[in-house]
Amino acid sequence: MSYLFTSESVSEGHPDKVSDQISDAILDQFLATDPDSKVACETLVTTGQVVLAGEVKSRSYVDVQETARRVIEKIGYTKSEYGFDARSCGIFSSIHGQSADINRGVDRSDRSEQGAGDQGMMFGYATNETENYMPLTVDLAHHLLYELATIRKEPSSPMPYLRPDAKSQVTIEHDDEGRPVRIDTIVISTQHDEFVQASDGISEAEADRMMQERIHHDIATILIPRVKMLYKPEIAALFDEKVRLFVNPTGKFVIGGPHGDTGLTGRKIIVDTYGGRASHGGGAFSGKDPSKVDRSAAYAARHIAKNMVAAGVADEMLVQVAYAIGVAEPVSIYVNTKGRSHVALSDGQIAEKIKKIFDMRPYAIEQRLKLRNPIYEETAAYGHFGREPYEAYKTFVDEHGTEQMRIVELFTWEKLDYVNKIKAEFGLS
């Protein structure tokens, strides 16, 4: 029997994502000049104000206020009428040193035996229903908002009224084998200028209706066609005439961003991962250096699941890894192929083979995925997974105020670089 499944996403201008991006930009600044930095940075944003807090152990000096302002400006909060803008917002920092009790459990004279930064369980997931091995619901939700932000930033934007804050939600019908067969519902809520105002002959309700009609029309005729072009024909065909499209269902969305809602780092953990299709251990990612296995082990688990599915071991795979604080080796690795395995092994036997192929000690993960580089700001909006790996030039400022250019490799955990090893281990052609 068919079923409906729903995932959501939020834009880079959503207050929680503003916080995530600031936290990760500060992390990157520390890692750029001291790769061994230990960082846990939390951010709160609200009307006209940013609050930074957390713990750091580093040889670097970072101008956290200027870093935060740069991120806010890049997102698009540049006008005082937004109630939150890069140049005028107040920034308060309460970042202090890392606990020595935590640090003693992580640092080792033999770096390969570096302990996990905390206890916990982390999950990785992959499915072959899309080319990037992500659930289509969350992948589409991300693409809708990424493309909407692209439209907003275009010099001659066809939607010039757009503001940075936005949310999306996608409901897809799946057949009884879990394959997407039809897009049922798309919801887009986007912040906008008050480009039609009440005046003589136009009531406030009529002005609101006119704005909503214009935005709905533009979403349907500008945004949706552009997003369809991003997908191969069989996915684009799921956009049929029966799709229900809700645009700004409340009727008006002028007050938004941190002025409309307070934002906090780490509050969009399902958006950041698999849109609810897979389990989540509860730990957020942004603002954390890779000694925190909440982040590094979740990336490693995704890397495993994606390569295993790409190698043909299963059509779908969930990987759980768990740690004890201060201990290098994981306490457990669990696999669930949801009955969609293509090898004559139990899920437990598959997990044993994973242990042979992948070293899941924290330091080994850091080295394999190059996680001690300043690569995190780009992850903090539109999902940490399903992204294309690429090299980027990034500029950082050292403690002397000198700009440094770095070439870094982003989204290394999305590489399909273990497929051949997996095929050899499992006897797959």
Curated annotation (Swiss-Prot):
Keywords: ATP-binding, Cytoplasm, Magnesium, Metal-binding, Nucleotide-binding, One-carbon metabolism, Potassium, Transferase
Binding residues annotated for L-methionine, in chain numbering: 55, 98, 261, 292
Binding residues for ATP: 14, 165-167, 252-253, 261, 267-268, 284, 288
One GO CC annotation: cytoplasm
Keyword match Nucleotide-binding: yes
Subcellular location: Cytoplasm
Residues the entry annotates as binding Mg(2+): 16
Main subcellular localisation: cytoplasm
GO biological process: one-carbon metabolic process; S-adenosylmethionine biosynthetic process
Pathway this chain belongs to: Amino-acid biosynthesis; S-adenosyl-L-methionine biosynthesis; S-adenosyl-L-methionine from L-methionine: step 1/1
The enzyme's E.C. designation: 2.5.1.6
Cofactor(s) for this UniProt protein: Mg(2+); K(+)
Recorded coiled-coil stretches: none
Keyword Secreted applies: no
Region described as Flexible loop: spans on this chain: 98-108
EC supergroup of this enzyme: transferase
Gene3D superfamilies from the UniProt entry: 3.30.300.10
Any Pfam family hit: S-AdoMet_synt_M
PROSITE patterns: ADOMET_SYNTHASE_1, ADOMET_SYNTHASE_2
Molecular function terms, GO-annotated: ATP binding; magnesium ion binding; methionine adenosyltransferase activity
Function: Catalyzes the formation of S-adenosylmethionine (AdoMet) from methionine and ATP. The overall synthetic reaction is composed of two sequential steps, AdoMet formation and the subsequent tripolyphosphate hydrolysis which occurs prior to release of AdoMet from the enzyme.
Subunit composition and interactions: Homotetramer; dimer of dimers.
Family: Belongs to the AdoMet synthase family.
Protein's name according to its UniProt entry: S-adenosylmethionine synthase
Gene source species: Porphyromonas gingivalis (strain ATCC 33277 / DSM 20709 / CIP 103683 / JCM 12257 / NCTC 11834 / 2561)
Protein encoded by which gene: metK
